[in-house]
Structure formats: structure tokens, C-alpha cells
Amino acid sequence: MAVADNPFSMSTMFNALPNPKGISGSIPPPGFAPRASATPLHAALFNLMTDGDGVSYFKEMISNSDKTELQRMASLLTSDSDYFMSIVTTKFGSRRVQKLLGKSDDVDAFFCAAILRRFLHITTDKYASYVTIRAMVVFDKVMKKALYERILYHALDLACDQHGCIALNDIITDADDPYYRDQLLELVASNALRLSNDASGNFVVQHVLTLYDSRCIHNIAVNLYGQCIELSFKKYGSYIVEKLLEVEESMVVVVVELLGCDGDRLMRLARNEFGNFVVVKALRFTKMSRMDLFWGLVQKLMPFIRLLRRSHGSNIANILDSFRLRC
């Protein structure tokens, strides 16, 4: 593809591009592995999109380009999947592609196709994932639907990835289609146990609980019943159980499990560096709305009050002391 075959409004881009690193238009910059189809224009455009010193030049070029020219630029950027990936996986490349999203449906169509071709790789990348997040905000309904379908298909892969879980959380938060939002919440809820035990997935469970969707919270609580105590011994698992205690319906599920375990296990949980926060929260929230459950916990914990004083459970012992003095 020759330069003459791709006229931009910025047709003099080669000559105008800043070249502080001494990279010529015919020599691809570091990070870009050219294919046989690569042209000097590909190399120059790569430099424009990824050079940390080219912010003002990029803004000026975009502001002076009409829709047709932006469409040609989008076509070139997405002409090869590896080339597109080499751009969006860089800090500045990701930011500048995000700036191009939403300019027109024709421009978005090129980017939508490019994202779909490498969806999982893009959405689990530290920088490229923000391109998907932005696309889900500005694309039209048809393109969003295509992306939603891909998100649902790969949702568990995203949830269990350190960068993908962040992208999935943002996508769920901003989801403007009730059907797909419910589908995503249901998928998280039905896989709550697996995700709660995953280093990244637990952040997704924590996040959806903060959305206070009653149906989702109920489903998560049901799917975690019988596992809440085990989760409470773990740092991030305890955060999930604490969130469940904040809503009465799911609180009952957790407290019933606490009351159903043997006293020795509850004592060990109350003395645990993470579990003690779960027990404290259970006491505080049951006291506000379910005194029957509250007194059940007090009676079950009281025989261990001396052991609790000499551990992470000292705060629980203080709560028990305050009620023993009142009685």
C-alpha cells in the first residue's frame, strides 16, 4: 500500500511528524515488528500514536481532520491485527485510540472489528483494556451488542485476569443494556465460589456486591452458603463475606452458617486476623435488625471470651463484655 493510496487531510504527515528520536519514516520505531505489507506510512502512524512527545501534534491533527480522513486513519490503524495490538498495548497508543472512538459510526466500525478480532488479548492487557472500556461507552447499540456477546463468552477469563477483572468491573458498572447487565451479574453470581477463591476474580464478586442489586446479592449468598466460614479465614474472601453481612437477606445466610458450625471453629475464626472482622460485623449488623441471631452469636462466643482477649479477637471480647455487664 503506497502513501499516495491513503491520502489523509494530513497528507504531509511524513514530513510534519516530529522526529525527536531520529526515527525516519521508512524505519519502523521500536516495538513495531513490520510485516511484508507494512509501509512507511504504517511506521509514521505508529510513531504518531505512541510517541510520548507527540500529544499536541496528535490533537492538532485530529482536530483538523474531517470524518472521511479519520475513517481512512482508522482503516490504516486496524488494517493488521498485530499492528493494531502493537499500538493499543502502549500507554500513549491506548489513550490516542480512545480519543478516536466515538468520532463517527464509520470510524467506530473499524475499531469494533479490530477489538473483536483480538478481544481477549486486548481486554486483558494493562493499557489496551481501556480501549474496550471506552468502546462500551461510546459505540452504538449494534456494535455494543457484538461486544457484549464477546464479553459474556469470555467473562470468566476476564474476571480471573489481573487486568481483565478491572475492565469487567468497569463494563458492568457502565452497562446501559438491562438484559446484558443482568446476564453479567447472573454469571458472576452463579460462579461466585470459583471467583471468590481466585486472586483476581474475588475483586469482581466484591464489586458486584457494591452495586446492591438484590437479586444478585441473594444469588451470591446462596451459592456461597456453606463456604462463608472458609472464605472468612482469607484476606479477600473475608471482604466478600463482610459485604454479604451488609444486606439483611444475605446477612441471615452468613449468620446461620456461623451459628451452625461447632464452637471451636467459630472461636478460631473470631481469633483469626481476617475472620475477626467478619464476626464483629456479624455482631453489629444482627444487633441492628435481628436480635435473635445476635443473641445466638453472643451465647456461642461467650465461653471463649478469655481466649478472645489474647488474640485478634480482643475487639469481639470487648463487645461481649459490654453485654455481659448489662445483663
Curated annotation (Swiss-Prot):
GO BP terms: regulation of translation
Pumilio repeats mapped onto the chain: 79-114, 115-149, 150-185, 186-222, 223-260, 261-295
Domain of life: Eukaryota
Protein location: Cytoplasm
Role this protein plays: Sequence-specific RNA-binding protein that regulates translation and mRNA stability by binding the 3'-UTR of target mRNAs.
Domain comment, as recorded: The pumilio repeats mediate the association with RNA by packing together to form a right-handed superhelix that approximates a half donut. The number as well as the specific sequence of the repeats determine the specificity for target mRNAs.
Listed name of the protein: Pumilio homolog 18
Organism encoding this protein: Arabidopsis thaliana (Mouse-ear cress)
Gene name of this polypeptide: APUM18
